[in-house]
Amino acid sequence: MKLPITIEYNSGEQATYIAQPPEWAKWEKQTGHTISQAKEKLGMWDLMFLAYNAHKREKAGTPVKPFEAWMETISDVIVGDANPKATEKEA
């Protein structure tokens, strides 16, 4: 399951992170919930946790702020694809 999560930082900058199976596995381990419960159980902390871990994975070993400090830089969280790809109409 892939879930795009767009983070808007206090600076106004936005970044979209894709929560993929590694992030979901960490979420399951951290929360004790299973992926089948995600729809009912996902809250703001969960979304930031998933985005943070996707961000960390994308940085591939480059140091990132600790989770708690990183959360303090966020002004908004947007779930899903805000700009879905346009599809061509059939002729």
Task: Cite the ranges covered by each PLM segment.
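Charged interaction scaffolds used for protein-protein
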Residues: 1-15, 25-45, 49-91
